[in-house]
A protein has these predicted regions:
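Hydrophobic alpha-helical transmembrane segments of multi-pass membrane transport/permease proteins
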Residues: 1-2, 22-33, 137-152
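Terminal transmembrane helical anchor/hairpin motif
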Residues: 2-5, 9, 147-179
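Secretory targeting signals
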Residues: 4-24, 64, 69-128
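Long, hydrophobic alpha-helical segments
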Residues: 19-42, 74
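Hydrophobic/aromatic residues in alpha-helical transmembrane segments
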Residues: 32-36, 84, 120, 149
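Transmembrane helix boundary and interhelical loop/hinge segments in multi-pass membrane proteins
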Residues: 33-53, 67
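A structural motif at transmembrane helix-loop-helix junctions in multipass membrane proteins
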Residues: 111-163
């Protein structure tokens, strides 16, 4: 945001990684869900799923293949976008090893985040018969995991006022959120 990093002695990659991490939590799950929500439900609607399942390919192999392919697409987009952004920032403003480590960590965690939400989207697609239903559930999942979950935790921490929930339950609930 505006004024981010004012008075902080960190290189551009470290500051950019922090900014992009915030943005990534919103966009990567949404992109992964949009990419994967109709992978199986859409094929069932179009009539191509029975054809794919008529081959000697097992259901789990089809699911795994779609997961790997869609995760590769999300990962490639992340890698290309972040490499261009980070490379440009580093070339224009310089970098330090700590910033490079932060940048690589950002890429790795963003790819993992994308993979989790591709898997969720495929699970939704596999469990619904229509792509419209899968789309509605996928958007609902995004809303719950990315927006409402954190708001509910924040409200619970405020209501707890530093009590047992904040000290012992809250850290585990933060880790339980895939976003």
């Amino acid at each position: 945001g505006a004024g981010q990093g004012a008075g902080v002695k960190a290189d551009i990659l470290t500051l950019s990684a922090a900014s992009l991490a915030t943005l990534s939590v919103y966009l990567i799950p949404l992109i992964a869900l949009i990419l994967s929500y109709d992978a199986l439900a859409g094929e069932a609607e179009r009539g191509t799923l029975p054809l794919a399942l008529a081959t000697p390919v097992k259901r789990w192999e089809l699911f795994a293949g779609k997961f790997l392919a869609q995760t590769a697409v999300v990962s490639a987009a992340i890698l290309i976008g972040y490499t261009i952004a980070g490379g440009t920032a580093a070339a224009l403003m310089g970098w330090q090893m700590a910033g490079l480590v932060a940048w690589v960590r950002l890429i790795a965690t963003s790819v993992a985040l994308g993979a989790v939400f591709v898997a969720l989207g495929l699970a939704v697609s596999a469990s619904t018969a229509r792509s419209g239903t899968a789309a509605a559930i996928a958007i609902g999942l995004w809303l719950v995991f990315v927006v409402l979950y954190d708001l509910a935790l924040l409200g619970a921490v405020i209501a707890d006022n530093g009590g047992a929930f904040t000290k012992s339950v809250f850290p585990w609930l933060v880790l339980a959120n895939p976003a």
